[in-house]
Amino acid sequence: MQHWTRNHTLDLTLCALCAAAIAVCSWITLPATIPFTLQSFAIFLILLLFEGKRATVSVTVYLLLGAVGLPVFAGMKGGIGVLSGPTGGFLIGFLVMALLDWSIGLICKKRSLVVKVVCLAAEQMVCYLFGSLWYWLYTGSGGLGTAFAVCVLPFLPVDFLKLLLATAIYHPIRKRISHI
């Protein structure tokens, strides 16, 4: 039996808080075909602050809470229907982003903030691809290009701003939590 330490408790607490932060950011919504939310902002910030396992566990917990029906997704929705619906690919894409970031972190132990931000932008592109493909397969309308135009192009400038904001507040937050 594993001995629980302060670090285990801290990890669990941080993962729970990060999952809650994603949920709260998902509730801040502007309705559209694919709703505009602050989820990606929370994901960006979590991936900057807590690389690897903590970030991946946080996103997984968020998705599991939503899958069992808690209203943690955009529009205060929950349930497996949201995950399997037209926007489910973007939600799963957040997990893919975290897994990619963890993998990159294992390969490149010391990444500068600039490298981290470039990695996040590339990981977001993978999320866009995953979500657009899912949306296209779900709706069956148009082609992948049409799905990309509907699901990604309107979000590029806003998501770029979210990434800049997450980067801007990274250092002050990192400084405050570095002692825990």
Language model region names:
Residues 58-62, 70-73, 97, 101, ...:
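Alpha-helical transmembrane segments and their lipid-water interface positions
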Residues 28, 49, 75-76, 104-108, ...:
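Helix-loop junctions at the membrane-solvent interface of multi-pass transporters
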Residues 2, 10, 17, 24, ...:
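Short helix-perturbing small/polar motifs within transmembrane alpha-helices
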Residues 76, 109-180:
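Membrane-embedded alpha-helical hairpins and interfacial helices in multi-pass inner-membrane proteins
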Residues 1-56:
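Hydrophobic transmembrane alpha-helices
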